[in-house]
UniProtKB/Swiss-Prot annotation:
It comes from Methanosarcina barkeri (strain Fusaro / DSM 804). This is Preprotein translocase subunit SecG. Pfam families: Sec61_beta (PF03911). Residues 52-55 are extracellular. The chain crosses the membrane at residues 30-51. InterPro entries: Preprot_translocase_SecG, SecG/Sec61-beta/Sbh.
Length: 55
């Protein structure tokens, strides 16, 4: 039987592309997401109260 050579490189090629894309992605800390979400929520509540949509 013939041995398969080079099969390890093909299986790891997808992982290498994933990690390269991950390095190029925008890095956002979880604190920033929570703070922006809280600010947007407060702004929505404030604007709805000002416009008379308060429950």
């Amino acid at each position: 039987m013939a041995k398969k050579s080079g099969s390890g490189l093909q299986s790891s090629a997808g992982l290498m592309r994933y990690y390269e894309a991950d390095k190029n992605a925008v890095q956002v800390q979880p604190k920033v997401v929570l703070i922006v979400g809280a600010i947007v929520g407060i702004a929505v509540l404030f604007l709805s109260a000002v416009n008379g949509f308060w429950p």
